[in-house]
Amino acid sequence: MYLEKINGPEDVKKIKIDELPVLAQEIRDALLVRASKHGGHFGPNFGMVEATIALHYVFESPKDKIVYDVSHQSYPHKMLTGRKEAYLSEQHYDDVSGYTNPNESEHDFFTVGHTSTSVSLAAGLAKARDLKGENGNVIAVIGDGSLSGGEALEGLDFAAELQSNFIIIVNDNDMSIAENHGGLYQNLALLRKTDGQAECNLFKAMGLDYVYVDRGNDVAALIKAFKEVKDSTKPVVVHINTLKGKGYAPAEKCKEQWHYSGPFDIETGKPLFDNVEVDYSSVTCEYLLEKMKNDSSVVAITSGTPTVMGFTEDKRKEAGSQFVDVGIAEETAVALASGIAVNGGKPFYGVYSSFVQRTFDQVSQDVCINNSPITMVIYQGSVYGMNDVTHLGFQDIPMLSNIPNLVYLAPATKEEYLAMLDWSMEQTSYPVAIKLPGGPMISDGSRVTKDFGRLNRYEVVQTGEKIAIIGLGTFFELAKEAAKLLKEEAGINATVINPYYITGLDEALLTKLKQNHDTVITLEDGILDGGFGEKIARFYGASNMKVMNYGLKKEFLDRYDVDAVLKENHLTAEQIAEDVLSIL
């Protein structure tokens, strides 16, 4: 095997060009076995094997700096830069992250995981090189799906001003996570159709030189093209036409499904663990499709992640023009929603918590200053959500809850969520965001009659004394568990409160608690700094009420164990009960 002997890029260069396809197959074989057991990003890596080999064959990493956009396609890169054991040995599968990481290797320059950043990051490396009078190639590798992001276009626009070595590899597989959306993809299609010869050329129009490689999975053709642009003295785009999922028939056939995979059977491609349980994504999709049938003004919006809202390909077709995918462009998604709302439409935008920071300016400026009645639903905004350092989901409360005019809600159950949607989609007074709870969806079958238009009215679900526990969203169940333990272990009958509202205080209820309570506990599924609990603590201020805030520390966690993090932050019922008893 060639792969077993590769400890760095210098070993790739020792292989004859006509033998490199053998190495490519070995890489795919290793990726296939690992993915079948461990899961991970599948299609992007299978499509980039030859390009990665060619990059390390031609360039001199790490002197020549390669920056991968998103970096979810960096598995072959890791295999060729001293980390092959993490893909060949099951015992070492967890030794590396799913994205580039400078702590792992000198061949990785940034910890990244979001789209459309590579060109700007690499341009910065090139600018610093020029200022220091150094040499070396700087290469940005970006997939066509990422070109729909504004930062990518901003980076391309700036790149032309460098007037020095800067190479941009556009990996064009005619796909984002799902299908591509937007006018620029018509130009990419035209360039593919004309073998890169079309007069209308996005990249040339931006002042960049341009090279087209039709056979983007032919390692010899790629090596030839990369040698042509190596040590170039001005910015150049190398547009390579690749096949997402290449080398595994099920992935080639169903590219969207195989963007990312869990463990599966190699022979059939079928998942080892069927996820048949109903979740918030499927509930959302069915709710919106039903509303669309009776109301043509309802619009579901996604920014390149349609399945976050349950909109698989068949559901998107069913929704027709009432479903909009703006591409990986969160800013546009929010501004579009505001425009739709102002003109009488009923926009719904679903987004992962990890991408909320990309929406902040538009939520603040385009939505909340204008008081546009949009509905924005936050998915996986929880310690139970994604656990890569680039995809954390517990920072949205401080971001969103402090924007004026926004009503930020936190349901604890499916029934509460649907009731909030019923109110939000029909009201025209406020912009509304809804933070879905983490973990398995809870459905208690209850009928929720609460009028959410009467803002900031909490609900007391258990009346007690001395101790009041306010459990927000995900942690409402934890509040009930802690109260139960206090009753069982110390005979304390605690008050339990479901606050519903992240953005406002029920001052009347909080004031009333002073009559027969001396301690208030807040629980939130997010970082404490600037969060929900601090607002409660500030309300009680100089009074005699003790306030204990429970949530997460402000830190970047990476590939963490949920139970360990909860325990470290005293977010277990046993620890909360113990803390309460220690101060009585």
Q: Model-found features: residue ranges?
A:
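N-terminal amphipathic, basic-rich helices that act as targeting or association modules
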Residues: 1-79, 215
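Glycine/charged-rich beta-loop-alpha catalytic/anionic-binding loops adjacent to active sites
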Residues: 29-36, 95-111, 133-139, 312-327, ...
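Active-site nucleophile and cofactor-binding loops and adjacent substrate-binding regions
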Residues: 39-48, 67-72, 101-120, 142-146, ...
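Glycine-rich ThDP/TPP pyrophosphate-binding loop and its adjacent helix/strand module
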Residues: 73, 108-264, 270-277, 282, ...
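A glycine-rich helix N-cap at a beta->alpha junction
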Residues: 86-96, 161-175, 368-380
